């Protein structure tokens, strides 16, 4: 079955194994998106014809564009510009779709996001946080005309897009019950984490100055809590309200 409302945009660069992992998960679905658009940044290990041929039976709607870009958010904008569905689901190579998230999907929605640590173990799930302004972007089904990704933000353009797209916050969106996404938590450098947090603070002051009064201290506190401790909390206290603030 095809859900003609939904387009999937998958971003990849030099990650053939991760891309195949994502495509294999999509191929297992009973309800498929109308199109799967892979935006590749000019990988050395990707041969378009081989991938398309490999998935030609189960994913005939697969299209691949491979050319240099200005990074992940530029690639996401490229994918957005060529989608024909009314809804878009963005996935990175390595993300795994499970269940049947696209079945009867008609409007902007949230998908459950299961975190997987570096050892392949489940370590909690994402929650809408920061007053409804933050959620893993793989867990959001966007309208096709959502706010584009601002390339002036190198790390947090997805957060900026959420701020500008969902004026009432993400908590107003319905949650899909019959499927979701597994997201692998890779190692992020301290420098990148700090820079991304600075971008989030900048965006809050610019677009949500009232929220910034309350959220900037939370973001700073998160920087001070070691990642290992946050993972421990996610893994061992799933129902605890603290999860919503890390």
Regions picked out by a protein language model, each given a short descriptive name:
Residues 140, 146-147, 153-179:
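A short, conserved alpha-helix in the catalytic core of glycosyltransferases
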Residues 88:
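Short aromatic/hydrophobic "clamp" motif used to bind/position activated sugar donors
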Residues 95-125:
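Conserved donor NDP-sugar-binding/catalytic core segment of glycosyltransferases
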Residues 22, 66-83:
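Glycine-rich, basic loop-to-helix element that forms the pyrophosphate-binding segment
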Residues 24-33:
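Short, acidic, metal-binding catalytic loop of nucleotide-sugar glycosyltransferases
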Residues 40-51, 92-94:
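A conserved acidic beta->alpha catalytic loop
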Residues 33-42, 65-67:
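Short beta-strand/loop segment that forms part of the nucleotide-sugar
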Residues 190-214:
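Catalytic core of nucleotide-sugar-dependent glycosyltransferases
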């Amino acid at each position: 079955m095809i859900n003609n409302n939904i387009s999937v945009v998958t971003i990849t660069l030099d990650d053939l194994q991760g891309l195949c992992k994502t495509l294999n998960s999509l191929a297992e679905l009973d309800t498929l998106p109308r199109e799967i658009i892979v935006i590749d940044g000019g990988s050395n290990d990707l041969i378009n014809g081989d991938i398309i041929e490999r998935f030609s039976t189960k994913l005939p709607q697969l299209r691949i564009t491979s050319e240099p870009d200005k990074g992940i958010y530029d690639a996401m904008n490229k994918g957005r510009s060529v989608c024909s569905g009314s809804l878009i689901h963005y996935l990175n190579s390595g993300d795994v779709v499970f269940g049947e998230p696209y079945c009867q999907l008609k409007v902007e929605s949230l998908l459950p996001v299961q975190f997987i640590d570096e050892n392949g173990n489940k370590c909690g799930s994402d929650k809408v946080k920061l007053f409804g302004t933050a959620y893993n972007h793989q867990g959001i089904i966007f309208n096709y005309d959502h706010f584009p990704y601002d390339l002036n933000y190198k790390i947090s353009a997805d957060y900026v897009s959420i701020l500008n797209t969902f004026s009432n916050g993400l908590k107003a969106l319905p949650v899909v019950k019959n499927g979701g996404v597994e997201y692998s938590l890779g190692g992020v450098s301290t420098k990148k984490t700090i820079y991304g947090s600075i971008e989030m603070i900048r965006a809050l002051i610019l677009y949500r100055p009232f929220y910034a009064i309350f959220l900037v201290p939370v973001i700073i506190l998160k920087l001070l809590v070691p990642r290992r401790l946050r993972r421990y909390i996610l893994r061992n206290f799933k129902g605890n309200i603290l999860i919503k603030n890390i």
